[in-house]
């Protein structure tokens, strides 16, 4: 098992099907002294009509990592809205990227994207990112 930052485990869910046993997953990870870190929760479409699910993840012990590209609208308006909700409600613990190709990098460094990052993440956090 490869962990991040001591005992953090980066976790992902299916994009097509909501998890049936998220509580059990969290429990199993936590009792083994690992910290679950949910990657890009804003991108799971089944949560777009139920933002309470993000709070529930936090209650279950998950840390949340928002994808920077999500803030820009790269993955669509619903994903951007969810990402902004998570950040605006102080539910995000980390921001990251899902950088798979050059186009992702181009969007991340675009002037409009930088303005969005500054707006939603604040100057201090953005400067640490740069």
Give the residues covered by each predicted segment.
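Extended substrate/RNA-proximal surfaces in nucleic-acid metabolism proteins
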Residues: 1-63
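Charged helix-capping and loop-helix junction motifs
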Residues: 23-26, 49-56, 77-87, 112-113
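Extended, charge-rich low-complexity interaction segments
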Residues: 10-11, 72-76
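Short acidic/histidine-rich active-site segments
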Residues: 91-107
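Active-site environment of divalent metal-dependent phosphoester hydrolases
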Residues: 43-47, 71-74, 100-105
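Active-site neighborhood of phospho(di)ester-bond hydrolases with catalytic His/Asp-centered motifs
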Residues: 37-39, 65-68, 93-97
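Mid-to-C-terminal alpha-helical segments outside catalytic/metal-binding sites
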Residues: 109-130
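His/Asp/Glu-enriched short active-site or ligand-binding loop at hydrolase and phosphoryl-transfer sites
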Residues: 61-73
